[in-house]
Amino acid sequence: MPYKPEDYKFVKYLWEDDVADKLDPIENLVYRSNKLGEDQRITNTGGGNTSAKLMGKDPLTGEEVEVLWVKGSGGDLRTSKKENFSSLYQDKLNALDSTYQSFVDKGYKSAGEDRMVGMFKHCNFCLNPRASSIDTPLHSMISEKHVDHLHPNAVISVASCKDQKALTEVIWGGKLAYVPWMRPGWEAAKLCEDTYAENPDIWGILLGQHGHTNWSNESKSCYETSLWVIETAARYIEEHDKGEMTFGGQKHSSLDGYSSKALLTKFLPVARGMLSNKVKFIGTVQNDEATLRFVNSVDAPRLAELGTSCPDHFLRTKIKPLYIDFNPEQDDVDTLIVKFEQGLEKYREDYTAYYNACKRDDSPAMRDPSPTVILIPGVGMVAWGKNKSESRVTAEFYNCAIEVMRGAEAISEYTALPAQEAFDIEYWALEEAKLQRMPAEKTLARDVVVVIGAGDGIGKATAHRVAREGAHVVCADLNLDNAKATAKELTDIYGQGIGVAGSGISACGPAIALAVDITRRETVEAMLADVVIAYGGIDKVIVTAGVFIAEGSDLAKNDKVFELSFGVNVKGGYIVASEAQKIWENQGLKGAMVLTTSVNAAVSKKGSLAYDTSKAAANHLMRELAVTLSPLINVNALAPATVVQGSNMFPRDRVISSLSKYDIAFADSESTESLRNKLAQFYAQRTLTKQPITPEDQAEAAYLLVSGQLSKTTGQVISVDGGLHEAFLR
């Protein structure tokens, strides 16, 4: 019988009658799903599905009909809402079996079985557009009203061990039946239906190499049965836990935090460059206790080579990770790089052999043969994906795989899915169709863009502009609070992504905030090291940070103004470039850098000698960097003029001084933005286009310079000044 709520040790009992009882039946299904997904030990991101057979009014006939509500394809239990569930006429789903039986090419893994997925949309209730899950037949064919299908680590541990069938009886005492591995689809659902018919007293079924499904006629009871199944497996595993001899015991010790970060800061860009032979990848570092216990163990090489078992896992992690035979007690980072390069070559050879051995006549073309998971003794795991969200999910799934192997090895012997079965999931026509339906990636989708000065003005606008194109944005600023505010704005707009993995800063989403003082090399070095740990490397750097300091007419008293102006506006850009150069050269991927100078660099005038000459020097710094960093990095400059809106270079007192200087009427009671607007309008009238210059105008030019659209442009200054003929470059 299910345990009392307070007795659960390995899952969280989260059901609250006071909440659930107030919900309508569909809301109750959503509630149950969210509570299951909220506990990471119950199911992984995007994995598993839930359903309820509910009565609803047919919009055509007005009659009450039975409707299957089931979590749709691509949804996540933790965050799903009503719109994430598909709804289908149950009687039409029942009738589909006769359609299937009429197919000549029916049977397990047949084209006819795959064709049934396309039939689901003909059963849609109320024109619900949500695509149905491949597991829809399973939920339909189980007669009980409520069905949960989950992928808990503890249960998959049993489903992935050598004695999975016998242990099903031992652990659950006949309350769960057992069916061997079958690829999800019509035939697997029919097998479960037949198994339940033959064993009417069971509460659920263990699905070999996959997970489990259970049911009830009450939603709360179904939830509690799910928890009971998982808790019972977890308790059995704990009773047989091998303690210090888990994974055969420890072979290596972990590096200390400082040494590990130093090693990764050099290794990750190199690895990213080697992996990105076709497209770039974003990394996630995992070095928690559980991961280190595995990678440091005696059995890690053997188990890693066996590969993963649950299909949810290896669709992200590939059939196996790349384990590097690194000795943290003896080897240095250069040795690690050599061993990684050798291991990568062997991995790609193995993957190509796997593809050629398992491919069928109609298989899709081989995908990138590079690993998505790298295991390093003493250091941890690095997972890779097309973006931060995907790499975090990949890390999460291999975390799950580690727990599955730990459990299976504790109670029996871990077994992976046979290579052909794994291939038939990885290269399944239905999975390929999903990939083909995915929208095209945005221009900067696989890029890491560091925007220095992102706390306000041009920098903030630039951070927003590149984020809109899919970039992973590092909002760096002298004022960390301002940087955090910009990063939060981006996260609020674009989300944190999915996946619940990553250690420290590498658990971040697509936008982070970091503090930096570009006049101090050690802070620049530390900031860029954090970027590497967060994302695996750096692609573009945009420096918008700058300083304008009012100076007196006595030149002899302006030494400090001169020193600070050149320190920020010139030396700062040089320090950033010289530190980024180390990463770019280790990475070996094309990149770009943009310095923000000024049209003042081209116009001689009175009253801003230090600022103007520093910006002129910055223009030539850009040209020198373009030569020095070629051909790997394109370096260009953005030259704004009179960007008043939102700029910390135009504080209220400077704006008032300028308004007074130009005899522009204003009131002391006006807001700073109102005063800035008046000054901007005045400046606009001095330009050829007669339009105020905004931070967004500058951001558009900065984006253009890093987008790849000007890939053959380097060493150039792009003026965004509305047309100041005095500043025309000659």
Regions picked out by a protein language model, each given a short descriptive name:
Residues 554, 603-609, 690:
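Active-site loop immediately N-terminal to the catalytic Tyr-X3-Lys motif
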Residues 630-634, 713-715:
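Short, small/polar-rich loop/turn modules that mediate ligand/substrate recognition or access, typified
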Residues 577, 614:
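Active-site helix of classical SDR
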Residues 1-449, 461:
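Glycine-rich flexible loops
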Residues 546, 703, 714-730:
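Short C-terminal tail/terminal secondary-structure segment
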Residues 598:
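Residue(s) in the substrate-gating loop at a strand-loop-helix junction
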Residues 552-563, 683:
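Substrate-binding pocket helix/loop in short-chain dehydrogenase/reductase
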